[in-house]
């Protein structure tokens, strides 16, 4: 038996301990007490737990077997003993010793238990197919006596037969457990066998020597695992693993076991991964069976002879994931706390690689030695992935699921997204604020709101009254009054302090007021503090006695009501000299050259000589903030050297070049001055032909000499659309007044342009604003004429009669008909001409045009008309009435507010600068062209190329001329007397704005005169003449934007007449008007005429009218709603696009 090598225990195989590590003294001690220890392990598992093999447990930890739960190795050793003791009969002699040892150790078991725990039902290390049989054997083992223990060992023998590794023989009396390595591969061990060896993993220190004496076979002391690294509180020397390992050694005889047997036993273990549902380490995949190659590799490694260092190297490879076993199984569950490698799970067991400790999240830990409470949930298969194991089994503050080791069988799966292992449903149970509950609408009532009325209270109150039933419904609220009140409050100066108040006491009051306002209005800027030296000293009382500084009079410390507006930033001076200096500097700045260059408001208010009333200056906000004393302002200005005062002392102006600043055309309205009103009558009373053309000739000089003139017109343009519906001119006369003397019309114009308070009659917001002068009456016809041009869809004949047509003179024409210059083909030239025509029209409507027309020798007028002719009443109404200038008195009336003055200014600008009906329409609609140039084709068409059938593409193209128009201001005058040309009497003089047209020898004519001339040319020279074609072209373009019924009827009548005799230019121009005019403004009667004329034209074999109808139906937005004649529909279906009209039909080609 000596040649037999003893079989190592499974704990030694797993831990890889060298047998030479044990001391000789321990070997002798194990040999003496081996009988007692073996009996203790066989009879009952509680007894074995009372005396656990500490040394063996410590050796397991050193070898890295921290993953195996407690009790698994012991259960295997029992199976091994059963298999070995079947042929051996020496085991019976050891029974009495085992019985005695069992009786002695039982009382020690009770104090070892730290915490109560349920008995485990499943052995996580070995789950075999013979699970039921092994469970029954384990139950019998607990109840039977010593003979029953022997029978249990014998019945367990067939289980050992599965082991493929040979079992080394040893003395049975010394080593009862050499069979442990063989059952490692077995799977027949029941789960219940796990309960007993793991019930008490810790034993008292007193039992340590008893277990140590039992192990005789251990010749060396096993190195212990530093469990302080795992649990932090168990020392290697006192760990119960030593007891467990020493107790385990009693199953092995005291004989020596070679390392070769250790490796054979290790290789014989079944490493198949049959566990299902076990948590994985990092792989996350299901466990798979190991291949036969892995088993062969393990067997080859077990059969090799190696030293203890070689075995340690093998286990180090296993830890570092370098062994073949670990390489083939990457989905193993590993304990991160104890660095365990071996595990049993789901009926299989095997080695597992070591995984780096990643916070212990995915790696279950075996039960610690300090925790005696075990259950079947201690196996790694019951630990959820997202739960970190608690290394300290005694952590009582930990969750119940993780307390006592890895007891996670009752732990509920926590939500990953909720802290402390909570679940999603727990959030709803927790109280939340109202703004966090988004699942429903939260009524957020105002806590200060009164309680809601009950049904009885609502019934008692009854329904709400109607607005009509409420008495005193008209509150007569005046918005302008409110604004003026705020205006006066804003610019109102703070009150002076009482002169009898001591400066020191006044400063105290100001500090108190500042503190008071700061507490209620933290955003208010601090009130400027007044220094004592700025305040006037106390005045002398009656009798010449000065009041003492600290008199006994009570001081009123009440804080007055703080105004809405902030107080002025600068303190108000208390002396008149300082105040005059401030006022003088402020007014001098108004009249400085720097300010006048940009202050158009002052320049419009100036008279011809540059004067402005002092009352106007006194009403400015900055001046009013300094003082409202009119006499003080006059006194301050008398000492000024930078402003000049008028002889009467009521007006001031700039001292240097005062006449260059006024903007004369806009001087009128509420703040008009007596300068223009006093000089204007003298100009209008002049008679003679020289005075007639003076206003017209003086206008270009004014525009060229004054650099501010263009700026004035830009100001007027910015107010387009604001003067809609207002009367525009006082020079318009009715048919009854056409032949009245021109002096009467002059007087009306004079009264209309220079009346002081004319603006009050044209602004509803300031009705009754104080204008006392009589407003001149406007002629009725002018109102009707202009309103007809604005409000009606059609332009009246009275507007057409004011048209001024500009066409090239006949001298520019040649036989080829190409009269246009090179500049006319450029877009820049056309744009400049367009701008010049608009400016010319504005000036025609702005500057009054007075012309002396010879009247009849005999005429009768009334007395009123005679007085108006003389201009007596107008002179009184205008020049004799001085402007309302307040007198220098103490009771100065409050000037008009800024709102009123702005409204007056807008009204004055819109009235004094009238706009033509065309400009008013353009302010509401899009702009219309006033110049119609000739757009010649870029290159002549080839004779063989397809083209449209129109007169321009014929062999003899018609003569076309550009044409322009502007709207004049006066109606067409009657025929001029003998000796005066019609054009010179009705057309205004040439203007610089149309200098480009004058360079190209354009001639301007009144529309009626030009039309008659064209009709005469048509009658005398034939239907196809240049003048008539120009008239057709003008009608075609002008009627698209400005439709006039009479003009259209005449256009259509003459075009159809020319078409009957073969002249096509007029009918083609008519078709162009139909197509583009209906697109801009659809008129049903015009559309009917369009289809009728096109039908007639198509029946004659022409296609131009059909092409324009086709183009209109394609561009029109309402084409689908229009009804087309059946004949035209059939003809239109022959063409798909406008390009198809270039190709003539086959019938036409033949």
Curated annotation (Swiss-Prot):
Basic residues biased stretches: 75-85
Interaction with mRNA: region residues: 990-1140
UniProt-listed InterPro entries: DM15 (IPR006607), La_dom_prot (IPR045180), La_HTH (IPR006630), WH-like_DNA-bd_sf (IPR036388), WH_DNA-bd_sf (IPR036390)
Null mutant phenotype: Oogenesis defects similar to defects due to hyperactive Ras-MAPK signaling. Increased mRNA levels of several components of the MAPK-signaling pathway.
Residue ranges with Gly residues bias: 274-285
Any Pfam family the entry gives: La
The keyword RNA-binding appears for this protein: yes
Bias kind Polar residues: ranges: 336-346, 370-380, 403-412, 675-686, 856-865
GO cellular component, one term: cytoplasmic stress granule
Entry GO MF terms: poly(G) binding; poly(U) RNA binding; RNA binding; RNA cap binding
Any GO BP: oogenesis
Stretch list, region Disordered: 1-105, 161-461, 667-784, 851-958
HTH La-type RNA-binding domain segment(s): 573-665
Cell compartments where the protein resides: Cytoplasm, P-body
Name of the protein in question: La-related protein 1
Organism: Caenorhabditis elegans
Gene designation: larp-1
